[in-house]
Amino acid sequence: MTGAVTIIGGGLAGCEAAWQIAGRGVRVVLREMKPQRYSPAHHLSGLAELVCSNSLRGESLENAVGLLKEELRRAGSLIMAAADATRVPAGGALAVDRELFSSYVTERIEGHPLIELVREEVTELPAEGVLVIASGPLTSDALAERLKQITGDSLYFYDAIAPIVAADSLDSDKVFRASRYGKGDGDDYLNCPLSEEEYERFVDAVLAAEKVPARDFEKVVHFEGCMPVEEMAERGRETLRFGPLKPVGLTDPRTGREPHAVVQLRAENREGTLFNLVGFQTKLTWPEQRRVFRMIPGLESAEFVRLGSMHRNTFINAPTLLEPTFRLKGDPRTFFAGQITGVEGYVESAGSGFLAGINSARLVRGEDPAVPPPVTALGALVAHITTAPARHFQPMNVNYGLFPPLEGKVKKKDRRGRLAERALAELDHWLATV
């Protein structure tokens, strides 16, 4: 294919994609609706606006997001250059001055000779040319209607995220494997049994826990079929026990009896290193989630690799729709990038923009698509987003539970360092080819 690549959306992913495409000698038309029109959450006229926190999270390679940052730095990321140039003191985290950050990105985009910035709302998808859709979690209604034409029923408007825990942080003396009534393979779920006393204490804690207040543009949301656990508890003390915590069809091998209540954990990935709390979508604050959910037997020392949330979020079912290159299956000219792909987080969005950018440029240049090695942070995230079980797909941030295991025995305290070391070595080899 020839000509310019059109990018819809001037957020982190769209700007990163534009930078990578232009850096490979391909023209870009970047279309951003601000300041002609603002979403309910945006206020700055500049590009790459950080809507929520000004933190890009941890810097250490002990955190997978810290590793992803380092990978993007090595890959020549515009977003990471902007973050490093506009950082503010934040301990072990990378936080930025959000206005300076936006200005930095805007100036670089506007100053690049191969990038044309068009500030107007997109309501129709271009019929020709390579396209990167990076319209973000607050995609306008008009554009969302057009996206339905290419995504069908696989376009969602709200997420309902349950917490995810690392399997190796669970207490195996308390948790048992079983499926309700022995269905499936008979041991598909991990089960945390609660006595009546433990259940009552848990309900009390849920009812008393602090909740995240809804933002103005989220207050009309009705979560059909995925009510927050705290709202279920408010309906009555037994509601949870007849809902997600129902014990029927399960026998605690320690007692030989049906527990009073059971919290079920379902595998989040094929390797079985991550498990989500089934039915535990919630709007409790993150500190309260850690405190309250660690009251569940077996989860006392649980490592939460993702905490629960429920908010406005336009995203597609990536396992159904996307190739590992972030190209749309069945439509070789269209790519997706950013939170609309189901990645969660600023850095993850930039990473997806990087990959969609280099692959759309490679398409224009007649080159084969590139997929990062699965042992890298970017590769592990891409592999999860595009191969996770489609039926239960929800947005995901990068975490070490997504990575392929190391070969041989490695002490737990050394594991993350070794994963990071392996990732960066493989990344350097891969970058030399793209």
Curated annotation (Swiss-Prot):
Residues annotated as binding FAD: 9-14
The UniProt record lists the keyword S-adenosyl-L-methionine: no
Pfam families documented for this protein: GIDA
Enzyme class: transferase
Coiled coil (UniProt feature): none
Recorded GO MF terms: flavin adenine dinucleotide binding; tRNA (uracil(54)-C5)-methyltransferase activity, 5,10-methylenetetrahydrofolate-dependent
Top-level division of the source organism's lineage: Bacteria
Single GO BP term: tRNA methylation
Alphabetical list of PROSITE patterns matching this protein: GIDA_2 (PS01281)
PANTHER family xrefs: GLUCOSE INHIBITED DIVISION PROTEIN A, METHYLENETETRAHYDROFOLATE--TRNA-(URACIL-5-)-METHYLTRANSFERASE TRMFO
Protein name (record): Methylenetetrahydrofolate--tRNA-(uracil-5-)-methyltransferase TrmFO
Source organism (scientific name): Geobacter sulfurreducens (strain ATCC 51573 / DSM 12127 / PCA)
Taxon lineage: Bacteria, Pseudomonadati, Thermodesulfobacteriota, Desulfuromonadia, Geobacterales
